[in-house]
Amino acid sequence: MPERVFSKEESYTMKKQLALVLAVAMVSASLAACGGTSTAPATTAAPAETEAPAETAAPETEAPAETEAAAAEEEIPDAASLLSDAFIDPVGDWAQYDELIAQIKAETDMAHRTELMHQAEDILMSNYAVVPIYYYNDLYMSKPYVKGVYANAFATKFFMYAEMENGSDTLRLNLASEPDFLDPALNSSVDGACLAANSFSGLYTYNAEGKPVPACAESYEVTEDGLTYTVKLKEGLKWSDGSDLTAADFEYSWKRAVDPKTAADYEYMFSGFDGYDDGEINVTAVDDTTLEFVLAAPCAYMEDLMAFPTFYPVKKEAVESYADWETTPGGWCQEAGFVSNGAFVCTGWNHDTSMTYEKNPYFWDADNVKLEKLEFMLSADDTAIYSAYNSDSVDFIDSVPTDEVAALIESQNPEFYVVDELGTYYIAFNVNSKLFEGKTPEQAACMRKAINILIDRDYIVENIGQTGQVIATSYIPLGMMDGNGGTFKDDPAVGYFDAYAINEDYDGTIAEATELLKAAGFKFGDDGKLDPSTPIDIEYLTNESSGHIAIAESLQQDLAAVGINISIGVQDWNVFLEERKNGNFDMAREGWIADFNDPINMLEMFTTTSGNNDPQYGRK
C-alpha cells in the first residue's frame, strides 16, 4: 500500500479546516486520494486602503427587477426530480420489493433471475437507506506455530483441524466480545457463526479451499426437476452427550427455525422450501439416516444452505429442558455444558471474560481433530487484544487497532494476514427515524442521498481501513456470482454514484448536497451551512472498536461541511445488536458478509419480515 503523505491526525485536521476555508474564503480545494498533498492556494486579503483606478471603476447600475425577484425567491427543485426512477416509498410501497424477492426465489430462468436481482438492487439503492462504504476484506494475526486454521469467503473461521507446533494442545484466541447467541438458529453475527461452526455440525461444512463438502451427510440425491432432496446421513452420528443423532433431529431443528415462537432472524433462509408460505416446511425424517425435503423452486446454492448455522441440528431434549424454553428459545445454551455435535463442546464460560471449548470425542471426525482445547478471550477492546497477542497471552486474534495497521503492513509482519471476503461495510438509516418526521418519502430520500455523497470514502479506506479495501458504489460486493455462470459485478468503477466526487469536485458536491437538502425543506445561511431554524441532528450508533469509531468520527467531519450534526453512541456488542435490530437509531454502522455466493442473500435480508431488516423497510 502506498504511503500517506499526511498522518491520521493531520488528515482529520485538514478535513475540519476545509469547511471553514470554504466558508470564509470560497477557496476551491480537494482532499487528496492516496496521499497527494493539497494544492489549494493560500488566501490573500485585498489591501484595505487601495483605491481602484478611476478608469476601471464599474459604473453604478440598478439591478433589473427580474434579477431582484430571482434573488428574492430561489427556485427549489422538486424532491422527486432528484431521485432515480427506481425509487419507491421504503415504508408504504415496500410490498413491491417483497414481491420482487419472492419472484426471484421462484424464478427458474437463470438469466431472467439475474435481471430481476439487478432490479432489486436498483430499488434498494434508490432510497439511500443503505449507504455502502467499502467492500470487505478480513485481517487477523496468528502465531507462526499455529497451523491449519482456515476461513471461507463468508468470514467463518474453522479451528477443528488446527495444530500447534509449539507442543501445546490448546489454541488461545480472540474473535470478539461476549456472543449474543450460541443457539445456531438464533445467531446472526459473524463471531457467533464461527463459534457455531466449531461446536455444531450440519449436513455440510467448508473445506480449506472454501468449498462446501459433506459433514453429517454421507451423500444426497436430487430429483431431475431440482426440487426433492434425499440426504443419507453418516452412520453412527452422536450428540456430545453420547446419545444418537438422527434425521429426526434435523427435521425438528429446521421446523423449529421457522417457527414464529423461535423468532430466528434467519428463518427466511427456508423461504425457498415447499410449504414455507403456509408455515410448515416440507422436510421429513424418512428413517434414522434419511432426510427428505422439498423445495418450491430449484436452488443452485443448496449445499451452502446445508452448511449454514441456521440449518444445524439442535437436540430437542436439550432445548426443551430449559424451564422457559417457549418464551426464551435460546436459553438452553446460555451457560457452559450444553449439548452440541461439533468438534468442540463448551465446558467453561466466564461471561464477558472467557470461554473454554474442549474436544468432543463423539464428533463424527474426531480422529482428525488434533487440539484438545480452545480458550477464548472475550473482548472488543482491540488495544487490549493486541497487547495480549504481543505478550503471548493469545495465539490468534481477529482484530487489530487501527493505529497499528500501517506499521504491520510496512514491516511486512509475517504474522499479519489480509484475506478476501465477500461482503460490504455500509451505513444504515432507520427509515422510520424521527429525522424524517414531516418529510415526504422523496424528501427523506433526498436527505439520505445528500449524506451519501458527502462521505469521503477514500479517506476511510486509506486512513482507517488501510488494508486495500475497495470503495463501494453498490451494495452487492465485487466478485459475487450472478447465479447464471457469471459475476454480478466485477468493475469497481461501475456503481450507483461517484464515490470520488467529494475529492475531485468538492465545491460541486457540496452544492449538490445543498440542493438536495433544500429540496427536502431545509434552509441555509450565508455561511453555506444549515440555518438554525432547520437543523439536522443525527444519532449514530456503533459498537466498541477503534475502526468503527474512527469511521463515525470521519462521517462527523464530512457532514459538518453543510452543518449536519452527528452525535456518536458507542455500545457493547450485545446491546448494539439489539438496539439496531429494534430500530432504535437514526444511523448505524452495518456490515454484511455473504452467507453464500449469490446476490439473493444480500437482497432478501431487506424484506419487510426479515429478522435482519435493520433499516425497518416496510414497517410502520
Short names for language-model regions:
Residues 218-266, 286, 292, 388, ...:
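Aromatic- and charge-enriched surface segment that lines or borders ligand/interaction sites
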Residues 72-171, 350, 454-490, 547-556, ...:
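Detector for C-terminal structural segments
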Residues 470-520, 544-549:
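Structural transition elements
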Residues 145, 221, 267-321:
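Surface-exposed binding/hinge segments that line
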Residues 65, 70-73, 80, 110, ...:
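Ligand/substrate-recognition segments at binding pockets and active sites
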Residues 251, 361-407, 565-567, 572:
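Ligand-site clamp/hinge motif
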Residues 160-162, 218, 225, 294-313, ...:
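Aromatic-rich, solvent-exposed beta-strand/loop patch
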Residues 132, 140-141, 174-224, 339:
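N-terminal lobe/hinge region of extracytoplasmic solute-binding protein
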